[in-house]
Amino acid sequence: MGMRMMFTVFLLVVLATTVVSSTSGRREFRGRNAAAKASDLVSLTDKKRGCCSDPRCNYDHPEICG
């Protein structure tokens, strides 16, 4: 194998390693983001139940009750 061929193989290995490591990190981040959004929705639903039934809270926080 010549030097040019060895260098090309080296670059391909580096590129493949970079692509695999960057895409696996994105999946984990997307999963955490989705979990955080779901948690926010659950807490908002709990606030809605308690606040919307109370007229004073409903008046003070119209953004929750809509």
From Swiss-Prot:
Changing residue 58 to I: In non-hydroxylated and non-gamma-carboxylated analog; 1.7-fold increase in potency of inhibition of rat alpha-9-alpha-10/CHRNA9-CHRNA10 nAChR. 25-fold increase in potency of inhibition of rat alpha-3-beta-2/CHRNA3-CHRNB2 nAChR. Residues 1-25 form the signal peptide. Disulfide bonds join 51-57, 52-65. Changing residue 58 to K: In non-hydroxylated and non-gamma-carboxylated analog; complete loss of potency of inhibition of rat alpha-9-alpha-10/CHRNA9-CHRNA10 nAChR. No change in potency of inhibition of HVA calcium channels in rat/mouse DRG neurons. Its main location: secreted. Expressed by the venom duct. The keyword Secreted applies. Changing residue 50 to K: In non-hydroxylated and non-gamma-carboxylated analog; no change in potency of inhibition of rat alpha-9-alpha-10/CHRNA9-CHRNA10 nAChR. Decrease in potency of inhibition of HVA calcium channels in rat/mouse DRG neurons. The keyword Transmembrane does not apply. The modification 4-carboxyglutamate is found at residue 63. The modification Cysteine amide is found at residue 65. The cysteine framework is I (CC-C-C). Alpha4/7 pattern. This is Alpha-conotoxin Vc1a.
